[in-house]
Design a protein with these regions (language model features):
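Bacterial Sec-dependent N-terminal signal peptides
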Residues: 1-23
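Short acidic, Pro/Gly- and aromatic-enriched capping/linker segments at domain boundaries
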Residues: 21-26, 250-267
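Polysaccharide-binding surfaces and accessory modules of carbohydrate-active proteins
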Residues: 23-36, 45-244, 260
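Short Pro-Gly-centered flexible turn/kink motifs
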Residues: 92-98, 264-283
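Short loop/turn motifs at secondary-structure junctions
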Residues: 139, 154, 273, 338-339, ...
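Short coil/turn motifs at secondary-structure junctions
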Residues: 148, 281-282, 398-400
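Terminal connector regions
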Residues: 279-310, 317
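Aromatic-lined carbohydrate-binding/catalytic grooves of carbohydrate-active enzymes
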Residues: 304-426
Length: 426
């Protein structure tokens, strides 16, 4: 009887241990926000909660869901995948299982969490990495992908993050525009299907749209009330923010580098790190989200963000290409009298053989124009010093006009496709 009792006790302890492991809870917290993951009985990592702060007891009480933390291609998952890879042997499927988690406090404000996931068949690893900024209520998330397969792995999709929501409605605010009409705010109610905010323009990724959004979970977004998620991708190149409402009215947000024409050959032992998505949740409307990002940017995102910025006067709208030393000296004097701290000389100051009198010539010839500035740039620098303000100058070194001395001497320096006419757009 004692033996049977011991066996029963061991069995119960084993069941308890398995249950505890299966429901391991990982909380990523700020002062007012919690993002919670759990490991289910199959060792799959699930997102179970993202919202207002939950203490440890409340976090443990959350229920396991079917929401994949980082969904992959080639499994039973049929929505947009965060990861799609072709392994060294040609296998197109990846299935990730929970391996472990590390949490370290980097400072009073920052906690770093690294969750390791591994494929069940290949030596292929994905690390979901987070920095939670407690006082600013911002979470920074990125992914690190590596492997030790015998041959390279080709990555086709490699998202920075995947966020899951189950709400009655979703209102998305995006920011888009064009030259001279930037950052227009447009709100749309999401319906079943996929809405992509994206750019394929490479280094000009912000020209028509911007990698940031608001998501309202309580009807149309409000400035001072309502549950709102705000996010921005810290990446200057081609990007995609994908918002997919599935057949159960769940919303999946996948953020990262645009996979369009962006496959990456990942060699063994190499680590591919994605850009980070910065995001925040608030129950107090878009204004609260905006101020959180302002505070975060001033402290962590901008060089000398805690310092007062220099006030400057730029001559572009006042003169365009039509100016000379006398005109610019007058603007410098007026700028100083009005309390500006810096004068910035804009386009039109350079090129002689093909003067920069319009946007059709001169780019690439970075010598001052002797007709407009007979005494050189040093004269304007000294004029600024006399008035007690700094001097700055505009350059566009990555561009060239065909009508320029630089292009005449080095046409081979221009980026283009062989046997194709040049694309002369800016």
């Amino acid at each position: 009887m004692k033996t049977l009792g011991r066996q029963m006790l061991c069995y119960l302890l084993l069941c308890f241990a398995v249950t505890t492991y299966a429901e391991e809870t990982i909380s990523i917290d700020t002062d007012n926000t919690s993002l919670i993951y759990k490991v289910d009985k199959d060792k799959k990592l699930r997102q179970v909660y993202f919202g207002s702060f939950l203490d440890a007891k409340e976090a443990e009480a959350t229920q396991v869901t079917k929401a994949d933390a980082y969904p992959t291609f080639g499994t039973s998952y049929v929505n947009e995948a965060a990861l799609r890879a072709v392994h060294g042997d040609g296998n197109t499927s990846t299935e990730l299982y929970f391996e472990g988690v590390e949490q370290n406090k980097l400072s009073d404000d920052i906690t770093q969490t690294i969750i390791t996931l591994k494929d069940g068949c290949f030596p292929f690893t994905v690390k979901l990495c987070f920095k939670s900024y407690a006082q600013n209520d911002v979470i920074e998330q990125w992914s690190e992908i590596s492997h030790t397969e015998k041959k390279p792995v080709t990555l086709y999709n490699y998202a920075s993050s995947h966020l899951f929501f189950n709400e009655p409605s979703y209102y998305l605010t995006q920011f888009c525009g064009e030259w001279a009409m930037e950052m227009n705010m447009v709100e749309t109610q999401l319906s079943r299907g996929v809405k992509n905010l994206e750019s394929k323009l490479g280094v000009r990724s912000n020209q028509h749209s911007h990698p940031c959004f608001y998501l309202s979970l309580d009807g149309k977004a409000q400035e001072k009330a309502g549950r709102v998620v705000g996010g921005t991708l810290a990446w200057p190149g081609s990007y995609r923010l994908s918002f997919e409402v599935d057949h159960r009215e769940n919303l999946h947000i996948i953020s990262g580098i645009n996979p369009y024409a962006s496959q990456y050959i990942l060699n063994p032992k190499e680590v591919f790190r994605t850009p980070a998505l910065l995001y925040s949740y608030s129950s107090k409307g878009t204004g609260d989200i905006s101020r959180r990002f302002h505070r975060w940017a001033k402290k962590y995102g901008i060089y000398r963000g805690d310092k007062t910025r220099t006030t400057l006067l730029n001559n572009w709208e006042a003169t365009y290409f039509d100016f000379n030393e006398e005109v610019l000296s007058g603007i410098i004097k007026d700028a100083a009298d009005m309390g500006f701290e810096l004068f910035l000389l804009d386009d039109g100051w350079f090129a002689n053989k093909y003067p920069r009198d319009n946007d059709k010539a001169g780019l690439g010839d970075w010598n001052y124009n002797k007709k407009k500035l007979p005494h050189g740039l040093g004269y304007l620098v000294n004029e600024s010093k006399k008035k007690g303000i700094k001097f700055g100058i505009w350059l566009e070194p990555e561009m060239v006009n065909p009508k320029s001395e630089l292009y005449e001497k080095h046409p081979d320096w221009v980026i283009g496709q062989p046997n194709r006419p040049l694309d002369l757009s800016r």
